[in-house]
């Protein structure tokens, strides 16, 4: 992505239940979170039940920074949940890290959440009027308080989850820890991914299947939209929560967010991205000498474009993975410097050549010109930019912090205007129809709200107020 900081995903979640009470699950959760680190790098946390109480450790930074062997040893228990976070609502501070926990008359619950609750402000105000106290500014803590409130009234967690689901508008994949019981929830249209696996007597859920691979578990199935899974004493109970004929799987998981070695709702992400590259060539061929990806997420699409076109594939840009995110840079000049630090050209692959540059998406476009300048300074004769995601014209309200509508470069500009701003010789976006075909899930089962404004849930009554809140909390 040209300026990866332009888009941030909400989170990654993990839940593990071992039938063997002598088996500690904290280390397995740690490794699973490591595999999901790409979904969030601001904070990480793990909660386990040790037979008497829910233990939690959270911290700011990467998984490897937050946990060490001593901390993992303290988190005893055969059942637990984990979380990695990027902020889409709520500031980046320790109070907003997850898992969250809440106490009720019978004990304590802990939750980890991936998604975004559109009506969280209204729900929070309602809870505060009832006397609930909040320690964070996130929508995820609202869910935690709602569950504890419902459980106080009727101590049945399946019932409580169903009641809370009726109140939530937005996206949510949840893992809920209640003593030795683990509950797993996916929203009625399945916006965020969630999968289920087994390893012997251990059962695992996670945002992506790569979390299963690292701990040697076998992917069994996806948690279906509207399903509740209850894990207890080695058994799994699947409950239909909110049946819905519509599905709305996030298309951006396939385009950018998910790791290419994941399988999301039955679709191999790497294969989808290869398809995108092949389709880009069919829709937007170019006379060129080399196909170059913007690393890393665009590599499969570039390979696909190269195969379809017969134009050689080349690694023309090298990514420095130790540079901080460019969105923290206050001025455009500093952001452009950060791009130069993050992406360095291989002059021998670019000089005097006509380049097909493959990227997954353009959101604001604020750092795109800087990267194009880098490639031109390396001696590229022509640059033909091909984008695997159709123009992003509307914001995401479901857990991807990309931009407000006025910040989106494609919201008020056509392709030719964007081409001139970015400074490339030609620009081609994949069409929505081809993207749907590449993913292999029919359009009515994908969320394409950011592309065409067709959102799967009601939107906030005051969009401007909601977007202002989101902007201030990033």
Curated annotation (Swiss-Prot):
EC no. given is 2.4.2.14
Q: Which reaction is recorded as catalysed by this protein?
A: 5-phospho-beta-D-ribosylamine + L-glutamate + diphosphate = 5-phospho-alpha-D-ribose 1-diphosphate + L-glutamine + H2O
Q: Report the pathway entry.
A: Purine metabolism; IMP biosynthesis via de novo pathway; N(1)-(5-phospho-D-ribosyl)glycinamide from 5-phospho-alpha-D-ribose 1-diphosphate: step 1/2
Biological processes, Gene Ontology terms: 'de novo' IMP biosynthetic process; purine nucleobase biosynthetic process
Q: Does the keyword Metal-binding apply?
A: yes
UniProt enzyme class: transferase
Can you tell me which residues bind [4Fe-4S] cluster? 250, 396, 447, 450
Query: Which residues does Mg(2+) bind?
Result: 297, 359-360
Task: Enumerate the CDD domains for this protein.
Answer: GPATase_N, PRTases_typeI
Q: Residues in the active site?
A: 11 (nucleophile)
**Record-level Gene Ontology MF annotations:** 4 iron, 4 sulfur cluster binding; amidophosphoribosyltransferase activity; magnesium ion binding
Pro-peptide residues, renumbered to this chain, are: 1-10
Q: Which controlled-vocabulary keywords does the entry list?
A: 4Fe-4S, Glutamine amidotransferase, Glycosyltransferase, Iron, Iron-sulfur, Magnesium, Metal-binding, Purine biosynthesis, Transferase
Cofactor(s) essential for the protein: Mg(2+); [4Fe-4S] cluster
Task: Note the NCBIfam families from the entry.
Answer: purF
Q: Which PANTHER family match?
A: AMIDOPHOSPHORIBOSYLTRANSFERASE
* Membership in a protein family: In the C-terminal section; belongs to the purine/pyrimidine phosphoribosyltransferase family.
User: What's this chain's function?
Assistant: Catalyzes the formation of phosphoribosylamine from phosphoribosylpyrophosphate (PRPP) and glutamine.
Q: What is this protein called?
A: Amidophosphoribosyltransferase
Source species, please? Methanothermobacter thermautotrophicus (strain ATCC 29096 / DSM 1053 / JCM 10044 / NBRC 100330 / Delta H)
Q: Which gene encodes it?
A: purF
């Amino acid at each position: 992505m040209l300026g990866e900081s332009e888009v941030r995903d909400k989170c990654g979640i993990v839940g593990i239940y071992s039938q063997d009470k002598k088996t500690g699950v904290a280390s397995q959760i740690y490794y699973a979170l490591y595999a999901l680190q790409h979904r969030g790098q601001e904070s990480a946390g793990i909660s386990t039940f040790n037979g008497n109480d829910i233990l939690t450790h959270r911290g700011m930074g990467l998984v490897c920074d937050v946990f060490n062997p001593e901390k993992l040893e303290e988190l005893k228990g055969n059942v637990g949940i984990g979380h990695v976070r990027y902020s889409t609502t709520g500031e980046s501070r320790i109070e907003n890290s997850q898992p969250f926990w809440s106490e009720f008359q019978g004990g304590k619950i802990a939750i980890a959440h991936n998604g975004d609750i559109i009506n969280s402000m209204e729900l929070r105000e309602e809870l505060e009027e009832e006397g609930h106290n909040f320690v964070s500014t996130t929508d995820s803590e609202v869910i935690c308080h709602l569950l504890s409130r419902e459980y106080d009234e009727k101590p049945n967690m399946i019932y409580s989850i169903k009641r809370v689901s009726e109140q939530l508008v937005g996206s949510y994949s949840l893992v809920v820890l209640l003593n030795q019981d683990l509950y797993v929830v996916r929203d009625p249209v399945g916006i965020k991914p969630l999968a289920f696996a087994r390893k012997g007597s251990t059962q695992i859920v996670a945002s992506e299947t790569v979390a299963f691979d690292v701990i040697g578990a076998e992917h069994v199935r996806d948690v279906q939209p509207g399903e509740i899974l209850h894990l207890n004493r080695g058994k799994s109970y699947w409950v239909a929560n909110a049946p819905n004929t519509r599905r709305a799987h996030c298309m951006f998981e396939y385009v950018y967010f998910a790791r290419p070695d994941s399988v999301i709702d039955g679709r191999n992400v790497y294969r989808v991205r290869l398809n995108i590259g092949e389709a880009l060539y069919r829709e937007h061929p170019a006379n060129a000498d080399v196909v170059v990806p913007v690393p890393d997420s665009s590599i499969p699409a570039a390979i696909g474009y190269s195969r379809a076109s017969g134009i050689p594939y080349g690694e023309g840009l090298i990514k420095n993975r130790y540079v901080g995110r460019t969105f923290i840079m206050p001025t455009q000049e500093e952001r452009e410097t950060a791009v130069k630090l993050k992406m360095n050209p291989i002059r021998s692959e670019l000089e005097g050549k006509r380049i097909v540059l493959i990227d997954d998406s353009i959101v604001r476009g604020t750092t795109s010109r800087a990267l194009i300048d880098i490639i031109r300074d390396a001696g590229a004769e022509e640059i033909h930019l091909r984008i695997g995601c159709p123009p992003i014209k509307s914001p995401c309200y479901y857990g991807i912090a990309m931009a407000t509508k006025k910040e989106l470069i494609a919201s008020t500009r056509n392709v030719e205007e964007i081409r001139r701003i970015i400074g490339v010789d030609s620009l081609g976006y994949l069409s929505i129809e081809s993207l749907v075909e590449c993913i292999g899930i029919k359009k009515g089962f994908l969320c394409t709200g950011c592309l065409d404004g067709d959102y799967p849930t009601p939107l906030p009554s005051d969009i401007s107020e909601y977007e202002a809140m989101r902007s201030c909390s990033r």
